[in-house]
A protein has these predicted regions:
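Hydrophobic alpha-helical interaction segments
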Residues: 143-271
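Positively charged, aromatic-accented nucleic-acid-binding surfaces
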Residues: 78-85, 94-97, 155, 233-236
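A general structural signal for short secondary-structure junctions and capping/turn motifs
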Residues: 46, 54, 101-104, 121-122, ...
Length: 271
């Protein structure tokens, strides 16, 4: 293998996962002069793939294998791959819960939150499925977290909480969601209240309040939730009662003006 090809491989190796833009940037410090993408692919990337030092995950996305790794035994890193699909993104919902170490179950899906202009088709790589979730705001309450030699963009704990309650289908359903959230440490409830109220969704404050009320009874990580905090949600409740789960026999929780499925809390306790 040519020396420059080997030098490019060594430059990419710490990344473990690289998009083609990463490869072009690394190549600019290895080769002399400038080169277009087709040339870099044909001259270097293709050779590294043939030498089993790069694995193509999808078009424009590659795994970099260490000298001791075998292609047939390669175990992909779901979070690292998800972080390289788009430049403007964040890992959210159940994927964020997994990052924070509180997810009740490990999912094969990775939820990559992007603006609709950055959409991509869902794809599978080995046992993992990578899915876009379309979000208008991809910058508020997003934090960069070190992950190996990389940085991941992840929704803050507070935004993760709100979004999981708001779109529970991306958090694994109510049982998985609640069991995961009860292990979410270090939640700043005041930071959670503000974005909830500013979203302007009529049903969201009552759902957030209801689940904070449940969680402070279930988890030591929510013992700091006070009635004063909950009252900020309570005074925002407007309009007719809403159903937490449609199509199920439910009873009205008058405090939160929310129809809750019968035996819902008992079922959660039995998880």
């Amino acid at each position: 293998m040519a020396n420059k090809t080997e030098a490019l491989y060594n430059a990419l190796l710490p990344m473990k996962i690289a998009g083609f833009d990463d490869i072009m940037q690394a190549a600019s410090s290895v080769i002399e002069g400038t080169a277009n993408r087709k040339y870099i692919y044909r001259k270097y990337v293709k050779r590294l793939i043939e030498a089993h030092k790069l694995l193509a995950i999808r078009k424009g996305l590659y795994a970099i294998l260490s000298p001791l790794e075998k292609a047939e035994k390669y175990e992909p890193d779901k979070l690292l791959i998800a972080s390289k699909i788009r430049k403007e993104y964040y890992l959210g919902f159940h994927t964020a819960l997994e990052f924070y170490g509180c997810a009740y179950s490990a999912f094969n899906e990775a939820y990559v939150c992007v603006n609709s202009k950055d959409r991509f088709d869902p794809f599978r790589y080995k046992r993992f499925i990578f899915k876009p979730v379309f979000i208008k705001d991809t910058t508020s309450q997003i934090v960069e977290k070190p992950y190996g030699s990389s940085l991941l963009r992840v929704s803050s704990k507070e935004r993760t909480f709100v979004e999981c309650i708001d779109r529970v289908q991306y958090a694994g359903g109510w049982e998985e969601c609640v069991k995961s959230l009860e292990n979410l440490r270090g939640l700043d409830v005041e930071k959670l209240i503000s974005p909830t109220l500013h979203q302007g969704k009529i049903g969201l404050p009552r759902r957030i309040g209801f689940f904070l009320d449940i969680l402070r009874k279930r988890s030591p990580f929510y013992e700091h939730v006070t009635d004063t905090m909950l009252s900020k949600m309570e005074i925002e409740i407007k309009g007719s009662p809403q159903y937490l789960v449609r199509g199920k026999k439910s009873s009205l929780n008058r405090r939160w003006n929310l129809y809750i499925p019968d035996a819902f809390e008992e079922q959660l306790r039995g998880i």
